[in-house]
Every structure is written in structure tokens, then in C-alpha cells.
């Protein structure tokens, strides 16, 4: 009981720090740092992403004390302070429940018409505060090197763009349009148009931005899918731009694409007057959409590599750390992975994996994406 009380107290302290962190987050520099952290840990929950950004914003690879030692041959340096995050620690409990027919799902009754009871085991959700450490806090066996610059030839760019197009909910085309915009999502046409003639990186940035709009702000599809009694609440233009630009920034950061210096200077004005739940909801939307888009791009990219006979590039690529709860000491996941609270390790993107197989002479740093005018 004493341990349970201590855990509740630690959870209360860390939850309070999260709430204060959200309030303080919407200053341009802090917000950009949060998005950079989110890009490295895009499957983490908003809470844990924020906790990492607050405690060690430059973290890249995280694991528990024992896992660093046992799985990676590394040890945490003496005196290093752990990063506190929230981890799920569900426990099982047996209870009496009404027995139901496995086919009809109706309660089974005895000869007197009373419900038959049976003992069943249920899982009770619970969370606790755990400490993890970044690779920079450890010493020992080297981890596989991750290439961070966007490099490669035109074939790689074309493959990536095709993966991006397959990840879009609407068709994407590249056409000559006015120089005043990099691209746009059309509600009436249900399509995305990107301006022709831009650099490869600028084209990718614009495409991600507009795909974010198509995924989040497509009210034609939303109204069609909603029940007649439901009313779709449309977001204001500033909120839509904050969400799309944040997603584009995080996704591009994940793939090592150097975007234009976006100060997010407008973020403080946008967040002013919004309550904590509104701000948290926007962060959840940005987090979930960016994570889904990254996963879809990776999946389509790997499929295209197979179609193009590039299996060896993927086969030879080394993943840096495993992608599940096992990186956290004492966590039992029972094969279950909760999307919202998943504490996964950062892994090299499929684009980064291919970089080591391309011509080194062709290596270049990413071009800066011109700041979007809207």
C-alpha cells in the first residue's frame, strides 16, 4: 500500500508538470523543440513527448538502465539523472461475472432463471513513473550509425514522392500554378496541387503540408461519413494552418529534411485564450496525424523498394533499437501495444536506411525549403 501511495504521489507531481508544460509550450522556441522531439519519438504519447522535451530535449535513443546493459552492452554513466516518463503497468484481477453464451452473447440462466456466475480474469489499467536514459548518458558498445542528412539520387526522390502520394487520402499532382503559393488542397475537387519547378525538398515539404490539410480538414468526407445527427465543427483558418504546418515540420524533421526557418512566432497569439483541454486536443491531433503519416510513408516506401528490386537496401539496413515497451525496465507488454501511450524507440527512417547504399559522391545536405506564403 505504501508503494502504491508513493506511485500516486509521483504520478500527481509529473501530471502537474505536464499541465504546466502545456501552458508554457506555446512559445515559438519551446514549440519548435517539442516538434523536433516528437519527430524523433513520433509513436510516443503527447504526455511522454512533452516530458522528454522538458527534461532532455536533445534525446535521440531511450532505454531503461537494465536494457542498456543487457541488450546493448552499454552502461549508464555514474551520476546521470534519468528521464522520468509515464509507463503502463496493468495488473490482472479475478472477478465474478455473469456467464454468457459464446454464440448469442446472452446471459446463461440456471433452472431457476437466475444468472449463472463465473470467475473471469480482467486487466486493470495502471500507470507508474519510470526512469529511462538517453544514449548520450551511456557508454559501451557502439550502436549502428544512423545517417542524418537527406542524400540520394533522383530515383530515391521519385520513390519517396510516390510513397507520399500513396499516403495521401486524395490525388496529388504537380502542376504550374501561381508563384504566390507552394500548393493547395481543393475541397471541391478533392485533390492536392503542388507547384511545379520547386526544389525536391521544397516539393516534399509542400506535399506533406497539404496532405495534412486533406487528412484533417476534409469536411466533405467528414460530413459524408458522419451520422445525420452529428454536426461537424469546422476549425478556424489559423488552427488549420497551425496543425498542418506543425505536422509538416515534424514529418520533415523525422526524414532529416531541413525545412525553412519557421519561427512559429504566431503560435503564442493563436494559443492565447484557449483552455488547457483545447491545447491538449490540438497537440493530440498533431501527434497522431504525424505518426500515422510517417508510418504510412515508411510502409509504402518499403513496398515500392520491393517493387523496384531494392530489397537488399532494406535487408542490409540495421535498426538501432527495438520498437516496443521492452526498452523500459520491468514493463510487461504481453504482446499488446497501445498506440496512444506506446513508448517506442526512435528508429532510422526508411529514407535514411537507403542512404548508406547510394553513391557517396552524390551526397548533399538538404536544400532549405522556402518559407510558405499564405
What role is predicted for each listed range?
Residues 1-325, 331, 364, 369-373:
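N-terminal accessory/interface modules of nucleic-acid-binding and processing proteins
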Residues 333-337, 347:
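Long, low-complexity, intrinsically disordered extramembrane tails
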Residues 344-373:
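Short acidic, low-complexity intrinsically disordered linear motifs used
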Amino acid at each position: 500500500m505504501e508503494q502504491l501511495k508513493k506511485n500516486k504521489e509521483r504520478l500527481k507531481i509529473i501530471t502537474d508538470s505536464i499541465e504546466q508544460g502545456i501552458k508554457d509550450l506555446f512559445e515559438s522556441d519551446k514549440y519548435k523543440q517539442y516538434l523536433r522531439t516528437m519527430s524523433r519519438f513520433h509513436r510516443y504519447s503527447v504526455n511522454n513527448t512533452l516530458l522528454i522535451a522538458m527534461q532532455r530535449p536533445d534525446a535521440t535513443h531511450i532505454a531503461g538502465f537494465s536494457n542498456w546493459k543487457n541488450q546493448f552492452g552499454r552502461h549508464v554513466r555514474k551520476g546521470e539523472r534519468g528521464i522520468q516518463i509515464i509507463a503502463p503497468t496493468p495488473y490482472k484481477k479475478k472477478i465474478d461475472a455473469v456467464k454468457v453464451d459464446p454464440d448469442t452473447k446472452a446471459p446463461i440462466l440456471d433452472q431457476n432463471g437466475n444468472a449463472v456466475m463465473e470467475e473471469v480474469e480482467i486487466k486493470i489499467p495502471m500507470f507508474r513513473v519510470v526512469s529511462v536514459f538517453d544514449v548520450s548518458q551511456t557508454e559501451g558498445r557502439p550502436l549502428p550509425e544512423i545517417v542524418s542528412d537527406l542524400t540520394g539520387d533522383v530515383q530515391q526522390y521519385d520513390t519517396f514522392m510516390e510513397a507520399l502520394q500513396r499516403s495521401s487520402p486524395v490525388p496529388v499532382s504537380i502542376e504550374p500554378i501561381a508563384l504566390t503559393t507552394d500548393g493547395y488542397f481543393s475541397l471541391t475537387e478533392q485533390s492536392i496541387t503542388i507547384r511545379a519547378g520547386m526544389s525536391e525538398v521544397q516539393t516534399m515539404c509542400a506535399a506533406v503540408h497539404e496532405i495534412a490539410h486533406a487528412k484533417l480538414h476534409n469536411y466533405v468526407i467528414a460530413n459524408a461519413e458522419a451520422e445525420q445527427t452529428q454536426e461537424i465543427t469546422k476549425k478556424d483558418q489559423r488552427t488549420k494552418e497551425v496543425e498542418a504546418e506543425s505536422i509538416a515540420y515534424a514529418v520533415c524533421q523525422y526524414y532529416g529534411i531541413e525545412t525553412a526557418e519557421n519561427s512559429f512566432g504566431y503560435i503564442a497569439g493563436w494559443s492565447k485564450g484557449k483552455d488547457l483541454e483545447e491545447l491538449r486536443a490540438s497537440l493530440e491531433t498533431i501527434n497522431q496525424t504525424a505518426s500515422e503519416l510517417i508510418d504510412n510513408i515508411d510502409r509504402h516506401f518499403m513496398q515500392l523498394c520491393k517493387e523496384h528490386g531494392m530489397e537488399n537496401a532494406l535487408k542490409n539496413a540495421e535498426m538501432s533499437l527495438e520498437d516496443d515497451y521492452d526498452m523500459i525496465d520491468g514493463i510487461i507488454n504481453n504482446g499488446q501495444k497501445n498506440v496512444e501511450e506506446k513508448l517506442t524507440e526512435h528508429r532510422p527512417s526508411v529514407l535514411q536506411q537507403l542512404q548508406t547504399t547510394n553513391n557517396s559522391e552524390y551526397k548533399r545536405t538538404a536544400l532549405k525549403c522556402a518559407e510558405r506564403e499564405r
